UniProtKB/Swiss-Prot annotation:
NCBIfam families: bL25_bact_ctc, PRK05618.1-2, PRK05618.1-5, PRK05943.1. GO terms for biological process: translation. Signal peptide: none annotated. Part of the 50S ribosomal subunit; part of the 5S rRNA/L5/L18/L25 subcomplex. Contacts the 5S rRNA. Binds to the 5S rRNA independently of L5 and L18. The gene is rplY. Gene3D superfamilies: Ribosomal protein L25, beta domain, Ribosomal Protein L25, Chain P. This is Large ribosomal subunit protein bL25.
Amino acid sequence: MKVIAFARKELGTGASRRQRIAGLTPGIVYGGTAAPVNISLDHNALYHALKKEAFHSSILDLEVDGKVEQVLLRDFQVHAYKQLVLHADFQRVDAKQKIHVKVPLHFVNAETSPAVKLHGGIISHVASELDITCLPSDLPEFVEVDLANLDVGHSIHLADIKLPKGVAAVIHGGEDNPTIATASVPAGKVEAEADAAAAAAASAAAAAPAGDKK
């Protein structure tokens, strides 16, 4: 994905305000051996790009005054209640150095899993993204989580996920194999099934004497 930007000379709160009035978003690109560069981006183009999932987890081609560098979107700020992007930070990447980034998890085959198809269960997503490390060329837009074999009372853990080649998960909090998704039967459904079973047992018990008289 390509991002067009321009180097900006004026800095400070007043300059940033004037840029936003002019339809531009101030930003910065940093990292690597080059000095940080303050930039301006077209606000509307950036606003719509930020709505795309891939924009947050892909290597971007950032063109600043005709010079193209590969970067990652590292941070952005938006207005509390206006549809306004206030600032964006981009980090340069080196093709030979591994990067550390969060990528979204895509859950597939929930409808055909035993938990849902056979038991009418609910699958809860414990995590929605995954911290990974890899070379820029190996960066996936997302990591797929296959729920096809998930049954009620069981979980999907990190070890159950097949990571793309060259990609390693970054573990936090000392947990070696964190839970990614769980499957359970809704409480109301469990109670309804228990009531139905009790009613069936009562009916069978009531019918038993009549059957014995035959």
